[in-house]
Amino acid sequence: MSRRCTEVKRKSLPSNKYQSISAATSNQIMLASKLINKLTHHGNKELVEKMLDKIIQHIKHKYKADGFEVLESACNNVKPSLQVESLRIGGATYQVPSPVNELRSYTLAIKWIINSAANRTFEKSMWQKIAEELYEASNGRGGAVKKKDDNHKMAEANQAFSHLITKRRSRGN
């Protein structure tokens, strides 16, 4: 048994810039701040906030849709309900499906959107790639939605091992 104290989960503070927008809901602001924090490299948060402004304006002008609503619907279309965990039992490794916490599902959705946007080759800059991927994900298309579907197919294929995760949790390992 570990002698360390349990880690306190820190809340990511929403960006001050988007709290003043009355049209955005608290869930949309939370998703925008998660996207900003995931894209930030070497502490350049202001640069990423400007990039998010470009993304929202691009969606607004090209598709005549609210950028925050597109972000929310894209994350809701991409977030997984099941994940596959590797579990080693008796020398064999099993892929065991387990349910996903809501905060983790949003984190995975944002990560998958960013990764599939980075793999796009049609657009030139990253903000254009993310804007297009967000719009496609909000319509149920794109690489991030495909990643979610692949994840769910893997979980369904390994449904026979789902009883192992309950045994593992009841033992306390």
UniProtKB/Swiss-Prot annotation:
Keywords: Ribonucleoprotein, Ribosomal protein, RNA-binding, rRNA-binding, tRNA-binding. One of its GO terms (molecular function) is structural constituent of ribosome. GO terms for cellular component: small ribosomal subunit. The keyword Cell cycle does not apply. SUPFAM superfamilies: Ribosomal protein S7 (SSF47973). GO terms for biological process: translation. Pfam families: Ribosomal_S7. Transmembrane segments: none annotated. One of the primary rRNA binding proteins, it binds directly to 16S rRNA where it nucleates assembly of the head domain of the 30S subunit. Is located at the subunit interface close to the decoding center, probably blocks exit of the E-site tRNA. Part of the 30S ribosomal subunit. Contacts proteins S9 and S11. Belongs to the universal ribosomal protein uS7 family. NCBIfam families: rpsG_bact (TIGR01029). This is Small ribosomal subunit protein uS7. The gene is rpsG.
